């Protein structure tokens, strides 16, 4: 049986369109707020409302999937995201935009939970790493192309919202031609997010998603600031960020393949060790191109491998709840990491960005090394 079945390919096509829209809005919303002369703290509050929506959406999507299935949950998530987009053009102002971005955040989180859960339920322990790698490749490719779109088209609010909303609605179309079966509805058993977070055998996967959130959130949010403080122009900053993201895209499939072939524990250990090496290399500033490349290739691939590790430790009917727990863990890490790193950079030195990344990665590496063996026969084998 092929890893990339027709439902999987159509799901990823829809995700690409939705990710393009997410990337465009995440880039332009802060700029629109600045053009409206809103103070910096209000811009930050609007961004925070989006991530708060992510947390809320993550919590209830599992119940929704169980009640109405993957397809309808996906349609509803896309419509909620589209509503959050249209609302930006209906009412302009701090409180209204904070509300609409909160709604958009809920829709985006629902999309991620639905897509990730559908992929994990469609796969097996032998190909789940490749499925999640394909998911991350599409996600980062959409993010990358979204940045290119921003640089090529008009950035005016009322020029952007119509075609972005159209792109979101177009993202629904691929799933109209297939049906993703939710096997969770065929069992009476149910699992909660809290139960998944407490599951001892999956703890390394949960911790890995937290670490991944810290690493990626810090790199995404603070790397441009770090490069700016090194005296680089905006064009140079864009180039180096492109190197970082491109490395993450190129690393997805090989890491997923290696994880399926040699085991997730071994690959996680190597990835975390490479993140530490890349962080140390960035401190020396001797060879930034290879340092950024290996940092991106290893750091951006932590999340799917950690997810695959955790998902092979649970029953098939627990996969949706486990995915919610992992996405929640990643979101918490992506909120805490940049906040703590920014405080260290402001009060002490910019180099503490990489020292912090290396430190949390080293702690996770110790956890991985303490795990003497990997389960030879994963529980979620179907």
From Swiss-Prot:
Subcellular location as annotated: Cell inner membrane
Membrane topology: Multi-pass membrane protein
Cysteines engaged in disulfide bonds, as pairs: none
GO molecular function: transmembrane transporter activity
Domain of life: Bacteria
Annotated keywords: Cell inner membrane, Cell membrane, Membrane, Transmembrane, Transmembrane helix, Transport
Gene Ontology cellular-component terms listed: plasma membrane
Predominant localisation class: membrane
TM spans (from-to): 8-28, 45-65, 75-95, 102-122, 131-151, 157-177, 204-224, 231-251, 270-290, 291-311, 325-345, 349-369
InterPro entries: MFS (IPR011701), MFS_dom (IPR020846), MFS_trans_sf (IPR036259), MFS_YcaD (IPR023745), MFS_YcaD-like (IPR047200)
Pfam families for this protein: MFS_1
Record carries keyword Metal-binding: no
HAMAP family linked: MFS_YcaD
Similarity-based family: Belongs to the major facilitator superfamily. YcaD (TC 2.A.1.26) family.
NCBIfam families: PRK03633.1 (NF002962)
Name of the protein in its database record: Uncharacterized MFS-type transporter YcaD
Upper taxonomic lineage: Bacteria, Pseudomonadati, Pseudomonadota, Gammaproteobacteria, Enterobacterales
Name of the gene encoding the protein in the UniProt record: ycaD
């Amino acid at each position: 049986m092929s890893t990339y079945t027709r439902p999987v390919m159509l799901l990823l096509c829809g995700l690409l369109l939705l990710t393009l829209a997410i990337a465009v809005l995440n880039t332009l919303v802060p700029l629109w707020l600045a053009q409206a002369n809103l103070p910096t703290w209000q811009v930050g509050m609007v961004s925070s409302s989006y991530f708060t929506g992510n947390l809320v959406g993550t919590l209830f999507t599992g119940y929704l999937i169980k009640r109405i299935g993957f397809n309808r949950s996906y349609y509803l998530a896309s419509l909620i995201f589209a509503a959050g987009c249209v609302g930006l053009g209906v009412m302009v102002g701090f409180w209204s935009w904070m509300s609409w971005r909160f709604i958009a955040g809920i829709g985006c989180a629902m999309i991620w939970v639905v897509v990730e859960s559908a992929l994990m339920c469609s796969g097996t322990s032998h190909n789940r790493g490749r499925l999640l790698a394909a998911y991350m490749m599409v996600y980062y490719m959409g993010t990358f192309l979204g940045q290119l779109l921003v640089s090529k088209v008009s950035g005016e609010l009322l020029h952007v919202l119509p075609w972005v909303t159209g792109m979101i609605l177009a993202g629904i179309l691929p799933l109209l031609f297939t049906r993703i079966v939710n096997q969770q509805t065929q069992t009476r058993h149910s699992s909660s997010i809290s139960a998944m977070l407490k599951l001892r055998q999956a703890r390394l996967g949960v911790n890995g998603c937290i670490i991944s959130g810290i690493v990626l959130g810090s790199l995404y949010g603070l790397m441009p600031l770090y490069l700016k403080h090194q005296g680089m122009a905006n064009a140079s900053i864009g180039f180096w960020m492109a190197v970082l993201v491109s490395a993450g895209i190129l690393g997805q499939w090989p890491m997923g393949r290696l994880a399926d072939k040699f085991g997730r524990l071994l690959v996680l250990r190597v990835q975390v060790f490479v993140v530490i090496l890349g962080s140390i290399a960035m401190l020396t500033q001797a060879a930034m191109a290879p340092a950024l490349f290996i940092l991106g290739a290893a750091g951006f691939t932590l999340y799917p491998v950690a997810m695959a590790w955790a998902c092979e430790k649970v029953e098939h009917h627990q996969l949706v709840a486990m995915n919610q727990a992992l996405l929640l863990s990643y979101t918490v890490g992506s909120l805490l990491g940049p906040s703590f790193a920014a405080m260290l950079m402001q009060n002490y030195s910019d180099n503490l960005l990489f020292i912090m990344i290396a430190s949390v990665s080293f702690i996770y590496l110790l956890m991985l090394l303490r795990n003497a063996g990997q389960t030879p026969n994963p529980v979620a084998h179907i």
